[in-house]
Amino acid sequence: SHSKHHATYVKGANDAVAKLEEARAQEDFSSILLSEKNLAFNLAGHVNHTIWWKNLSPNGGDKPTGELAAAIDDAFGSFDTFSAQFHAASTTVQGSGWAALGWDTLGNKLLIFQVYDHQTNFPLGIVPLLLLDMWEHA
């Protein structure tokens, strides 16, 4: 069922691309905005789920080691503090969305933030590392 759910976003993105191409060919510019919004939603749903699937592991659950552990300690003081802040971010998403841990390429540090719906509204310069699906179906 999870793969079918994810496939819906891929199909939605592909359909939106086809509708964009058709609207451009017909110079139907009023339809382009809706198709672009649908593309953003479905493509972000695909990307967010792709990252989320990679975050899951049957052997996971231990604290990170190496560079990630050092970056967490540097940004949050400890893994326990990071975990508490990430938990708070995930449980306070209003409506549908995601909790996210990302690398701020401008500030060179980790940040925790919320993503609403699927619009992939990551701050500019952020590389997403960890996503937690907080949609109702999750």
Swiss-Prot record:
Give the EC number(s) under which this enzyme is classified.
1.15.1.1
Q: Which residues bind Mn(2+)?
A: H2, H49, D133, H137
Tell me the SUPFAM superfamilies matching this sequence: Fe,Mn superoxide dismutase (SOD), C-terminal domain (SSF54719), Fe,Mn superoxide dismutase (SOD), N-terminal domain (SSF46609)
Report the cofactor remark: Binds 1 Mn(2+) ion per subunit.
The answer, when asked if Nucleotide-binding is one of the entry's keywords, is: no
Q: Which reaction does it catalyse?
A: 2 superoxide + 2 H(+) = H2O2 + O2
EC main class here is oxidoreductase
Q: Name one Pfam family in it.
A: Sod_Fe_N
What Gene3D superfamilies does this protein map onto? Fe,Mn superoxide dismutase (SOD) domain, Iron/manganese superoxide dismutase, C-terminal domain
Name any cofactors this protein relies on: Mn(2+)
Ordered alphabetically, the record's keywords are:
Manganese, Metal-binding, Oxidoreductase
Q: Name one GO molecular function term.
A: superoxide dismutase activity
Question: Which function does this protein serve?
Answer: Destroys superoxide anion radicals which are normally produced within the cells and which are toxic to biological systems.
Family, per the entry? Belongs to the iron/manganese superoxide dismutase family.
This one is known as Superoxide dismutase [Mn]
